[in-house]
Every structure is written in structure tokens, then in C-alpha cells.
Amino acid sequence: MYGHTEIQKKIQDKYDEIAALRKEQVAIAKSEGLSEVENYSFKDKNGNVVTLLDMFQSHDELIVVHNMGKSCPYCTLWADGLSSSTPHIQNRCGFALVSPNDYQTMSDFAANRDWKFPYYSGVETSFISDMGFSHQTEDGKVRYTPGFTTFLKKEDKIYRVACDLFGPGDLFSPIWPMMDMLHHSDKEWHPKFGY
């Protein structure tokens, strides 16, 4: 590729190992099998009620991103990146983002970021905690975790398929692997809302 064929072969071998490990990871994530979930209700950007079934649109599969809300620059980084991929994702399955912010806060923030995907407020539902993306701390505060859940629709029933977390260095934001290849890859960096 760039004149170091032995190095490139070693890199390709590692990619092959990573691909095999990723297959194992996906199999583990799906190993619980399908579990039926209720048809939760959310609010869209105008305050209208939208159900989980509605989010599938014309598809039988759905990806829901669990976003921690407008206060998290990391969640914003992932959402900004996913926004440009929305047409590709929606060609394959339903796609939406759910936030713990109220619908007006979420709507204002998403408009400011120019997000292209549908986004909903989950503030009046137990969906986020039921999916495992929030928990109560010892001091009584609610702590949110970012990630996504996949769903399958069979007739009018909804089944949870799998989930995964977002975090620095994950596979879901391409900037982390690219930054790893910088000379000073260990240099601490944090996303911001603006630069």
C-alpha cells in the first residue's frame, strides 16, 4: 500500500482478527434472543405523540440511538456523524434518536445542529431505563448512558434484538480510529459543541 508490505500484511492480519472478534461480540450481544417490548410513546419535535411502532416507518427493523441530551458533547459528536449517514441507514431500516430532554429542548438543539434523522423525547416514558440506558445513582440522580438498541417488528409486536454502548474509541464514530493513527495518538482530546 505504501511500500511497507510486511507492515501492511501485519496490519491486515490484525484487521482480520478484529473482524473475527467483532463477529463474536455481535453474537454475544444477540445471545439473549428476542425479547418483546411494549409500544412506548414519545413526543416528536412538535409535541405530537409518536409510538415505537411508528418509528419503524415502512421497515421491520429499527435502530434507536440513546442520546444523553443536549448537555453531552460526546453524544452530540455521535449524532452529528450519524446525521450525514441517515439516508443510508433509513434505506435499510427505521432510524431514530431518543433523548431524555423535553421535546422543545430537543427540537431547538437538533435544529441548531441540523440533524437529519427523526428525534424524540423520552422524558415521559420508562423506555430509556427499560432499555438499560439510565439508572439511579445512590444520591437519587438519574445517570444516562449513550448507545443504541436494535428492534424487530413482527406483525404488531416489537422485539428487542441487541444493544451496544457509545464511548470514546468505539467503532461507531470514525474519528477515533483515525485519531489513533496520529503521531500523538495519546494526546487527550474532547469534543466540543463548537470550535
Regions found by a protein language model. Name each.
Residues 52-73:
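Short active-site neighborhood of thiol/selenol oxidoreductases, capturing the structured segment around
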Residues 107-110, 130-131:
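A short acidic (Asp/Glu
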Residues 121-195:
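Thiol/selenol-based redox catalytic cores and closely related redox-interacting motifs
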Residues 89-105, 116-127:
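Thiol-based oxidoreductase modules, predominantly thioredoxin-like and allied folds used
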Residues 1-13:
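Short, charged, low-complexity amphipathic alpha-helix
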